[in-house]
A protein has these predicted regions:
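Alpha-helical transmission elements in cytosolic ATPase-linked domains
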Residues: 10, 14, 42, 46-49, ...
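Donor nucleotide-sugar binding loop of glycosyltransferases
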Residues: 4-7, 39, 94
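A conserved acidic beta->alpha catalytic loop
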Residues: 36-44, 91-92
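Acceptor/aglycone-binding surface of glycosyltransferases and processive sugar-polymer synthases
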Residues: 49, 56, 60-64, 68-78, ...
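Short, well-formed alpha-helical segments that are part of the catalytic scaffolds
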Residues: 4-23
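Short beta-strand/loop segment that forms part of the nucleotide-sugar
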Residues: 12, 23-38, 60-61
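Conserved beta-strand segments of alpha/beta enzyme cores
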Residues: 31, 56-58, 184
Length: 184
């Protein structure tokens, strides 16, 4: 994340609620691994404070902004759990879906439960048009079926996470990689 100091306390509060449910309902332990993508605000200071106070909080910090793909990859490399969740801290994705994602992975043969955007409300028509054309064009030139509206918010098994990490591309397009690695 980059310059998320204002939303991080709210995000952490929401994730703590998820932990309480997961711990009580499923006896699950969780680690929260934050990746600070070179923030210039107080994000890093907040993460340091939280790591000192909360044993579930860990973080990585980049010296400058390397971009979302690099931050996601670094987080996947550092994550050690049997299941790994990718979620942005801006609360645009509902953290409570983490519980449903976990329950789905526990009761199916899937290796990944991912979210997708079903509405582009609030976006300009031109942005929506280009987003549709991007996914349509990508599906035409690629053998990988990337779902329209695919988001990075997902939960993956360790096996799928390791498969994603085995692809060492420098210029990553994670949504494509998630679809290509061959897991359900």
């Amino acid at each position: 994340w980059h310059n998320e100091e204002e939303v991080l306390p709210l995000f952490l509060k929401e994730i703590e609620k998820i932990y309480e449910v997961m711990h009580v309902k499923h006896n699950v332990e969780m680690e929260y691994l934050f990746v600070d993508d070179g923030s210039t605000d107080r994000t890093l200071m907040f993460l340091r404070e939280q790591e000192a106070e909360n044993p579930r909080v860990n973080y990585l910090s980049f010296s400058r902004n390397f971009g979302k793909e690099a931050a996601m990859f670094a987080g996947l490399e550092k994550a050690s759990g049997d299941y790994v969740v990718i979620i942005d801290a801006d609360l645009q994705d509902p953290p409570e879906l983490i519980i449903e994602m976990y329950e789905t992975l526990q009761t199916t043969d899937y290796d990944c439960v991912a979210s997708r955007r079903v509405s582009r409300k609030g976006e300009s028509k031109i942005r929506s048009f280009f987003a549709r054309m991007f996914y349509k064009g990508l599906r035409k030139i690629s053998k990988v079926n990337i779902m329209y509206g695919a988001r990075d918010f997902r939960m993956m098994t360790r096996q799928m996470t390791d498969a994603v990490l085995s692809l060492r591309e420098y210029n990553r397009f994670s949504k494509g990689i998630f679809a290509w690695v061959g897991f359900n």
